[in-house]
Amino acid sequence: MAEIKPFYCVRPAAESASRVAALPYDVYNREEAKREVEKEPLSFLSIDRAETWFPDDVDTYDERVYVKAGEVLKEMEEKGIFVAEEVPCYYLYELTMNGHTQTGITACSSVDDYLNQIVKKHENTREDKEVDRIRHCLLY
């Protein structure tokens, strides 16, 4: 059986959640992401696609983009748009699409459980996208 634990989360404050909510980063191209952030500056895309803060000639994977993502998240946290949990928590979520509802849990799990396939991956990912997301998270 998988070992899971609660974790400290930085999440949108309840009053900001509807403005922060965004579709996954990889369903937008750069121009679409930029338009979404212009329409809603609190959108998580302003962090998740931080290249929207730069001219188009700045590469999406430029180090400045990752630094900006961390700066924007910290600024939003300072303004109370995001809040840091004071105690570790589990998070339940529910997704409904085409009349089908799924319920899930977000928690920390053991790397060994993942490597031993006790925790199953939900999709095949590309290494370049994994590196991008890792770099994105490390600058917070």
Positions of the model-derived regions?
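A cross-family signal for N-terminal binding/gating loops and helix N-caps
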Residues: M1-L139
